[in-house]
Every structure is written in structure tokens, then in C-alpha cells.
Amino acid sequence: MIDAEFKTALEQFGLELDEPLGMSLQQYAQSLWRYNEQINLTRHTTWDLFVTRDLRDCLQLAQLIQPGEEVLDMGSGNGVPGIPLAMLRPDIDVALAESVGKRAKVLDELVTELNLPVPVYAARGEDLLEDFRFTTIVSRAVGSLLKFCRWVEPHWSQFDRLLLIKGPKWVDERGEARHHGVLKGLELRVVATYPLGSVAPELAEAEEGDSPEAADASRGVILELTKKNKG
């Protein structure tokens, strides 16, 4: 059964999951918290935080990916968004890249424990792109927009787009990235904004340059970056 506190958190924040999916996500969170006692992986160690800070990001991201896509979670850390994404979307292929060896080992143990067909690479994502191609790279809380664009700049032939989960500082990060010229030749769009408080999630689309309501501290944002010359 789904834990009563988990179910209450889902209901409180307007989210619904079927029983098998809820059980899988519950097992992931509980296993993650168990490993967290040995190695620092997450500060989101309550059901409320798991739902509002982890699950909501993944639910929004899952809506933006097409069936059959090959997705790399770059700098996976505690497995968010990659592991929940693999549970939410079994019709896609997800791989995790984590350069910190201890964390990569935990991620490998987690996906084995959860019986997920998710390879874990103890490597930097940009190094993986030397040998592997993906449809989409996803990431959360791994460097600024400037740093991320610099990391992947030599490897655009190895993937089609970036989907980056960001918080209220994304507008400042965009300004910094523009100042350093790393957005030249790229198209940046806000493809999702959603509340992180007690309001039910919503999906909104906007073109770059629109009024950045998403910069509000209570909202999450997903940015999509593509090459302008890509169809």
C-alpha cells in the first residue's frame, strides 16, 4: 500500500498516481532516504518535499518527452529527474551520468533494487557524448546555464535538445549566458512553468523574451534549448 503520509502529500498538492506507480515512487524515495544516511544525496527527506521538490519536476518533464526518446540525465546526483522519469515513462530509454563515484555506485544499486532498465555511467555527461548519442539531455541543479552550455557546446551533433529544470534564478542565468555569447546559434524557450507550493501543477508555454512570471520564487521552470539550424 501507498504510505499514508505520501498519499496525503499527493492529495494536498493536487496530484494523483495509480497504485503501482505510487508504490514504485515510494520505494525509490524510501531507498534514497536510507542511502542518504550513509552519503549526502538529498535534503528532501519528507513526503511533502519529495512531492513538491522532486516529483513535481519529474511529472512536468515527463510531459515534454516523446515515446521512444533516448534520454540522458546529466549529473544525476540522487537520481532526479532520471529515475522517477524512467518510472513515469516506461516507453522511453533513460540513462544516468554521475561523475562522483560514490554517488554513481548508489545510483547503480538503486536502479538494480528498483528493477529498472536504466544504465548508470560513472562519468561526466560530456565525456559520454564522445561515444553515445541521445535524443534529449535532461538535468536539474547542475551548474548555471552558462556552464552547462559550455560543457555541451562541442557535442551538439550527439543530441537534439536540452531540457533543463531551473528555479527563480533562471532569468539571471540567461542574462549571464547571453553576455558571454554561449546562446548564439541556440533557441531557448520556456516550455513549462509550475507552482512549487500548494497549488495543483499547470503547464504553460512561452517564447523567449516573454514576461518572466516564472521567475517567481514559488515556481519551477523547464527550459528547452535547441540548435537554430536543427529542424
Curated annotation (Swiss-Prot):
InterPro entries: rRNA_ssu_MeTfrase_G, SAM-dependent_MTases_sf. The keyword Methyltransferase applies. Pfam families: GidB (PF02527). Residues 204-231 are annotated as: Disordered. It is found in: Cytoplasm. GO terms for cellular component: cytosol. GO terms for molecular function: rRNA (guanine-N7-)-methyltransferase activity. Keywords: Cytoplasm, Methyltransferase, rRNA processing, S-adenosyl-L-methionine, Transferase. S-adenosyl-L-methionine binds at residues 75, 125-126, 140. It is an enzyme of class 2 (transferase). The keyword Metal-binding does not apply. Its EC number is 2.1.1.-. Residues 204-213 have a biased composition (Acidic residues). HAMAP family: 16SrRNA_methyltr_G. Belongs to the methyltransferase superfamily. RNA methyltransferase RsmG family. Specifically methylates the N7 position of a guanine in 16S rRNA. NCBIfam families: rsmG_gidB. This is Ribosomal RNA small subunit methyltransferase G. It comes from Rhodopirellula baltica (strain DSM 10527 / NCIMB 13988 / SH1). The lineage of its organism: Bacteria, Pseudomonadati, Planctomycetota, Planctomycetia, Pirellulales. The gene is rsmG.
